[in-house]
Amino acid sequence: MSKKDHRKNFAHSNHEKTTEGDIVRYQNSQRLKKKFYEDELNKVQAELVKMQYWVKATGYRIVILFEGRDAAGKGGAIKRLTEPMNPRGCRVVALGTPSDQQKTQWYFQRYVEHLPSAGEIVIFDRSWYNRAGVEKVMGFATEKQVEQFYVDCPRFEQMLTEDGILLLKYWFSINDEEQEKRFQERIENEQRRWKLSPMDI
């Protein structure tokens, strides 16, 4: 594909990029053409394989957080990210509701045990930011616990990065109409129904 064709396909997606401080926002009002998407995905996945070799060779430790609204596409993005990777060096962590024992522990403790060793990539499908998100919204955490999280989270992440961990954080969002549409698709599709929780209905 020529550079001109590449630009044409990319422009067709009405791709918009805005920057606010350290935050980069991407907006797409149309879907990418399927062939263009698949071609680009193959290129990106090839680069991911190279990156994993580099991580192993250098001993880097990488943590990637995927956060966002329900049904925003976190799981699909993680699937495509990990498809080409060697599972020996890349793990996905998707923790459920804290157990009664975990509720008595330091809030970050259950995440610490999943942090990577040298040469590993760990992807969190939701993370410690649950405390400021779903736990806050659904009333699973007290106001005091949430306020303490706002103090502790930057300190915790600073400890990780100062120890040499490369921390990457991504937020996925969709509008209310698209979210409702995706919830309905999950209700109607038995193979996707497991993605629904009682809180989504």
Residue ranges and their predicted role:
Residues 46-56:
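Pre-Walker A adenine-sensing motif
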Residues 56-57, 85-87, 100-101, 113-117, ...:
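Conserved catalytic network of the ASCE P-loop NTPase/AAA+ motor domain
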